[in-house]
């Protein structure tokens, strides 16, 4: 299925540039420069070049065509991720289908007739995504949505309708996406429904629009039936704010008689429900008291649910269809680590399965159901084979008011404690630690291979990722506990996690850094401004500093979700909301910052405008408070161009080495390969001034 470019619920201020798929190689640095952290045999573990973590993957994003004839993936072509295709029975005969020179292609999906590979891309991180299609036989590339300042959304794609898809375009009104039928052969767009206020649409497998949703005055969502492309005036159901992040339709069966939902109404964790379309009656298919069910595994032909997964500490697949259970049991026996079924043929005889062993970068296998045979297709990062990667441990950490935060800890290889089982994750002595805060905040951290965890652990740090209140996946009560708690209880949760790590003997109390992107960047600024003595230093990546300007500059196509944002962050239209936003904005407390701060920002960020970083840097400069500020003119909400990601990480690890005493690889000409603009404070980041002089 194609990616969901905008969720039906509240859009997340997600930062994803740290994902391995988004990374691209720069020229490796020269001889590493290292600072030895306190502890036993700190240099006994080889230093892994950061380009091996964040450079281009060998291959990624594998897909199998619906007819089972082709394999596709993204892989480098002249240093940029492009689409490649190969016959299923001859993967070595791969050929590049695209020739992107600047912006990497991050993912793709097949047309239902298996003749076209579809993908989206933007310019310089502006998130004005256009839809492209490349003919597999001829290599002809089509730009299906060549409109300026327009974001495409894929609304419907079905194995029953081979020649077209449904897309949403906001070129008429930037706030709302009109629904069009796109003929894949000709590229013709035909208007299906003009949208005057709805946030999302759902189509059945005949590509008939069946459901529309929009936020209501209470901050929840109303759902409306659609008949003959007309939205009914009265909602068929309403979902309150408390359920809006955990309730959404998933899709219809092929006969159109059943609609599947994830639904938290009447329960805390979202269950998988089947709704009889004619009567409206619902039946609980599956539920788990620990965690939300967020999606299902559906039969490619009938659309009936066959399984689901529960992700609490780790991801646990569950079969519902007896015909599928032997396959999942086989995969569980044969695979060491977690696995995800990423692609299936229409005949459902072959699957692509991604495998994550944590201490090895993910690999992708072809699974032949009839033969019960699993064959490796590729490793995403073969250059890390044999590298000293380390385990990740899942923990449950209590907050001061009794909530449970699922969290993930990685400790350096040379500090692993052989006296403790790996699952405990206690190092032989306390080490410097990086608190890595996820974006969203309506998102979550999970178990698995994590390039940032591995990189920082290799430099000598423990790394802790925390699902603080407001994170999704752990029931609506936990998510809703974050409402109006930016910089308060959400921040208290992070402080509680640090205290847990210190008391457990994981972290040195005076050597804890805070780092993150988007909301994680906000948390970094909040950590240094609101609790200036708690952290040794901070790294903020595309984080908002002023909640007033953040809410005032959201993209126009988020208009339908504005009320939900106000209910969850703060309402700038009320005196109470204004007071809250003022006291939760780190900008207003910039004078309190006394620990080293590094800021990275994309100039074209449509979610967290560059002014968010400009403002706090200016405020710190006016008070002669040291800060290092790096802007990338060809990036948006995160650093998708891997030469830029590597460059910023080069500065980051040298910055952390001075702050925490870990190891660092030298910068050499890494910055030269990027578009980095050091707008302030090169003198405050070790090696940065020297790196800027490299010709």
Across the structure, where does each feature detected by a protein language model lie?
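Structural motif
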Residues: 80-84, 126-132, 174-180, 218-224, ...
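Active-site-proximal cap/loop segments of hydrolase catalytic domains
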Residues: 466-695
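Multi-bladed beta-propeller domains
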Residues: 29-59, 86-106, 111, 134-152, ...
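Non-catalytic accessory segments flanking enzyme active sites
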Residues: 60-63, 95, 106, 129, ...
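Bacterial N-terminal signal peptides
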Residues: 9-20
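Conserved beta-propeller blade repeats
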Residues: 56-74, 101-121, 131, 148-170, ...
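Cap/lid segment of the alpha/beta-hydrolase catalytic domain
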Residues: 380-513, 517-518, 523, 545, ...
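Bacterial N-terminal signal peptides that target proteins for export
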Residues: 1-11
């Amino acid at each position: 299925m194609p990616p969901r470019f905008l969720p039906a619920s509240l859009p997340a201020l997600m930062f994803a540039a740290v994902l391995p798929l988004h990374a691209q190689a720069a020229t490796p640095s020269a001889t590493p420069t290292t600072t030895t952290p306190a502890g036993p045999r700190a240099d006994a573990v080889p230093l892994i070049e950061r380009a091996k973590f964040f450079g281009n993957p060998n291959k990624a994003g594998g897909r199998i065509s619906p007819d089972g004839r082709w394999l596709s993936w993204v892989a480098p072509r002249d240093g940029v991720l492009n689409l490649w295709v190969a016959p299923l029975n001859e993967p070595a005969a791969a050929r590049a289908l695209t020739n992107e020179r600047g912006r990497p292609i991050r993912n793709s999906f097949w047309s239902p007739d298996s003749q076209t590979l579809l993908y989206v891309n933007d310019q310089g991180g502006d998130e004005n995504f256009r839809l492209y299609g490349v003919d597999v036989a001829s290599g002809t590339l089509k730009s299906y949505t060549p409109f300026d300042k327009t974001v495409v959304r894929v609304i419907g794609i079905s194995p029953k309708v081979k020649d077209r898809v449904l897309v949403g375009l906001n070129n008429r009104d930037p706030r709302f996406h009109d629904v069009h039928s796109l003929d894949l052969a000709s590229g013709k767009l035909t208007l299906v429904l003009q949208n005057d206020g709805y946030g999302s649409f759902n189509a059945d497998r005949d590509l008939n629009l069946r459901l529309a949703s929009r936020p209501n005055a209470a901050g929840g969502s109303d759902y409306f039936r659609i008949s003959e492309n007309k939205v009914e005036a009265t909602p068929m159901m309403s979902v309150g704010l408390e359920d809006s992040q955990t309730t959404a339709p998933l899709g219809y069966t092929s006969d159109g008689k059943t609609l599947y939902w994830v639904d938290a109404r009447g329960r805390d964790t979202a269950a998988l429900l089947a709704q009889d379309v004619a009567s409206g009656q619902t039946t609980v298919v599956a539920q788990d008291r620990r965690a939300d069910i967020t999606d299902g595994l559906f039969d490619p032909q009938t659309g009936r649910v066959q399984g689901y997964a529960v992700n609490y500490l780790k991801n646990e697949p569950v079969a519902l269809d007896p015909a599928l259970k032997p396959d999942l049991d086989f995969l569980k026996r044969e695979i060491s680590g977690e696995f995800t079924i990423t692609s299936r043929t229409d005949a459902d005889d072959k699957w692509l399965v991604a495998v994550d062993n944590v201490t090895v970068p993910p690999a992708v296998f072809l699974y032949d159901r009839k033969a019960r045979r699993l064959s490796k297709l590729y490793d995403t990062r073969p250059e890390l084979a044999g590298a000293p990667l380390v385990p990740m441990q899942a923990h449950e950490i209590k907050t001061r008011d009794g909530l449970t935060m699922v969290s993930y800890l990685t400790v350096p290889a040379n500090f692993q404690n052989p006296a403790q089982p790996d699952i405990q994750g206690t190092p032989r002595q306390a080490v410097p630690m990086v608190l890595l805060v996820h974006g969203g905040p309506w998102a979550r951290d999970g178990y698995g291979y994590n390039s940032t965890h591995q990189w920082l652990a290799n430099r000598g740090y423990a790394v802790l990722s925390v699902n603080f209140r407001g994170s999704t996946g752990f029931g609506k009560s936990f998510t809703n506990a974050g409402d109006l708690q930016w910089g308060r209880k959400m921040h208290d949760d992070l402080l509680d996690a640090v205290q847990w790590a210190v008391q457990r003997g994981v972290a040195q109390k005076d050597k804890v850094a805070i780092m993150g992107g988007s909301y994680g960047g906000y948390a970094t600024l909040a950590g240094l401004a609101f609790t200036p003595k708690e952290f040794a230093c901070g790294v903020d990546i595309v984080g908002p500093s002023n909640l007033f300007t953040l809410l005032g500059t959201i993209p126009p196509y988020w208009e339908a979700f504005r009320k939900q944002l106000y209910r969850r962050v703060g309402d700038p239209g009320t005196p109470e909301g204004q007071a809250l936003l003022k006291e939760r904005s780190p900008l207003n407390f910039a004078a309190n910052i006394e620990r080293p701060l590094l800021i990275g920002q994309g100039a074209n960020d449509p979610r967290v405008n560059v002014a968010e970083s400009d403002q706090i840097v200016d405020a710190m400069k006016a008070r002669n408070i040291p800060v290092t500020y790096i802007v990338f003119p060809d990036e948006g909400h995160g650093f998708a161009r891997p030469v830029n990601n590597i460059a910023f990480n080069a500065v980051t690890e040298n910055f952390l080495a001075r702050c925490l005493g870990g190891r660092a690889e030298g910068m050499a000409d890494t910055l030269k390969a990027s578009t980095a603009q050091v707008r302030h404070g090169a003198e405050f980041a070790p090696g940065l001034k020297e790196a800027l002089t490299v010709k």
